[in-house]
């Protein structure tokens, strides 16, 4: 009895010690589900960032081709008028003008007009003045040759040929007149044979010459005024 009581008292005096709790581990299914969700979220974020980058690149490529609308509102014909305004803006920039000077447009079938140097411009101006003076000279010469004033369409070659023939006729007439005057002054020719020469002058000039036939005792040469009155159109 005493031993049993001692055992009970000894058992009552000793209290049971608590055992340490093991850490809680999630199941394998929950772990894999969490990893899959994290991977899906990362993939979605990467896809969204890639899409945003692609949209930004497209906007940057389309920005030079689109016309900015006035006050932030696009007009009805924005797509048609956008290239025109962009072209105007580009052509007004000095950088583009310098690039156009360096480009070669011969392959497209046209070329940009180039400014002439000052020396070339002066040479062209002198050539134009020379041609103008030549034309004025021919117009003046055409007025002095026979039938030149009536025929205004006479070419330059015809005008020169007519002037040469006219000068030769005048020179021949002057030579004949000087020879006859010298012969009469020297006494080689007598007044009796002078009517033949007067008839020749009458046939050429178409006007009578009385100084050789009216008076047989004296001879009066032609004066310069009478010489100018001779008509030389019969030579042509």
From Swiss-Prot:
Stretches with biased composition (Pro residues): 17-26
GO function term, MF aspect, one: E-box binding
Gene3D superfamilies per UniProt: Helix-loop-helix DNA-binding domain
Biased composition regions of type Low complexity, renumbered to the chain: 42-70
Major localisation: nucleus
Places the protein is found: Nucleus
Effect of residue 127 to K: Found in two unrelated individuals with short-segment Hirschsprung disease, dysautonomia, increased lower limb reflexes and neurodevelopmental issues; likely pathogenic
Protein task: Transcription factor that plays a key role in neuronal differentiation: acts as a pioneer transcription factor, accessing closed chromatin to allow other factors to bind and activate neural pathways. Directly binds the E box motif (5'-CANNTG-3') on promoters and promotes transcription of neuronal genes. The combination of three transcription factors, ASCL1, POU3F2/BRN2 and MYT1L, is sufficient to reprogram fibroblasts and other somatic cells into induced neuronal (iN) cells in vitro.
Disease named in the record: Genetic variations in ASCL1 may play a role in disorders of the neurocristopathy spectrum manifesting with features of Hirschsprung disease, congenital central hypoventilation syndrome, dysautonomia, in addition to neurodevelopmental issues.
Protein name per UniProt: Achaete-scute homolog 1
Organism: Homo sapiens (Human)
């Amino acid at each position: 009895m005493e031993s049993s009581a001692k055992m009970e008292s000894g058992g009552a005096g000793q209290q049971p010690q608590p055992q340490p709790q093991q850490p809680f581990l999630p199941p394998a299914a929950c772990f894999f589900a969490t990893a899959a969700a994290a991977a899906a979220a990362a993939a979605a974020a990467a896809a969204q960032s890639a899409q945003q980058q692609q949209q930004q690149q497209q906007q940057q490529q389309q920005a030079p081709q689109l016309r900015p609308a006035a006050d932030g509102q696009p007009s009805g014909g924005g797509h048609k008028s956008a290239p025109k305004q962009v072209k105007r803006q580009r052509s007004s920039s000095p950088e583009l003008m310098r690039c156009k000077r360096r480009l070669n447009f011969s392959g497209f079938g046209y070329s940009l007009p180039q400014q002439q140097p000052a020396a070339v411009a002066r040479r062209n101006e002198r050539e134009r003045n020379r041609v103008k003076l030549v034309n004025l000279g021919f117009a003046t010469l055409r007025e002095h040759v026979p039938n030149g004033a009536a025929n205004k369409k006479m070419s330059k070659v015809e005008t020169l040929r007519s002037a040469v023939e006219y000068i030769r006729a005048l020179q021949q007439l002057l030579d004949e007149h000087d020879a006859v005057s010298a012969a009469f002054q020297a006494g080689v020719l007598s007044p009796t044979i002078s009517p033949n020469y007067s008839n020749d002058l009458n046939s050429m000039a178409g006007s009578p010459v009385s100084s050789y036939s009216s008076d047989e005792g004296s001879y009066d040469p032609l004066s310069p005024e009478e010489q100018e009155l001779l008509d030389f159109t019969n030579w042509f």
